[in-house]
Amino acid sequence: METSAYAIDVRGVTKKFGARTVVNDIAMQVRPGEIYGFLGPNGSGKTTFLRMLCGLLKPDAGSGQCLGLDFRRESAEIKKRVGYMTQKFSFYEDLTIEENLDFIARLYSMTQRKAAVEKSLERLGMIERRTQLAGTLSGGWKQRLALAACLIHEPQLLLLDEPTAGVDPKARRDFWEEIHKLAASGLTFLITTHYMDEASRCNRLAYIAYGNLLASGTVAEVVKAGGLTTWEISGEHLAALAEKIRGLPGVEQVVVFGTTLHVSGRDAEKFNASLSPFMANGQRWTKIESGLEDVFISLMETAKDNFT
């Protein structure tokens, strides 16, 4: 088998739990050193896909490579080269930062544990907090500890499952700065997230719903492929206007964005014909470029729920 040039190069990945298909025929290619975003609603199959990639869960179908290794037959070797950060903080809260990292180094049977722990502490700016109990850390510092633990064995690929969920905006920004620094050094990332601003920080991204891959590419490519026409409406009586236009021919979504409405549709002819009678009601109508959130809401609303 020829070694793939991609860090992740898989196709046809499928997983079923009973009669339910939770990951359906997914293909993905992620380049070395790339930050690849994986988006989708809760229960869409993101975590299941990550767990199959790193060998924690056996796929029912699919083929391909992860870090040049057959992702189905060589999962034990893949685990040694991958760092996996789970959604839930899973470290010992009654141990210090340093003790937690030393414990992880022991699990990997590292011969130079002390040096590895020191490097992780320094890399994530935790030298001065090394003796602090993990249970007393803020959400942002807990995420730093989790990232440090993922890095301690010098992996080539990091799988981060909603790493900034529940973290304040500044901590999220700092966390992403660390990710970009690490990616610049050649580390590859596959990151699940719900946040549109985080999706925009990724080199490329994919969107999954109900186990099906609905879109992939750069932000610009995904937005263009969405094919949406979007109007931003500001002014008075927006709630009443929203009720009147919701459900009209060509109108796919009516969403409140702060003090404005975003109204979108794919069939431009039907869409504009339905909205024309309302454009002289005193509100301000501005045609804008559709954003990721507009596209993803549209994808979600048109996706078939095969989980029910």
Predicted regions and their residues:
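Conserved ABC ATPase "signature" region
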Residues: 102, 106-129
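Helix-to-loop junction immediately C-terminal to a conserved catalytic motif
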Residues: 54
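Conserved ABC ATPase signature
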Residues: 94, 133-137
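Catalytic Walker B motif of ABC-type/P-loop ATPase nucleotide-binding domains
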Residues: 158-161
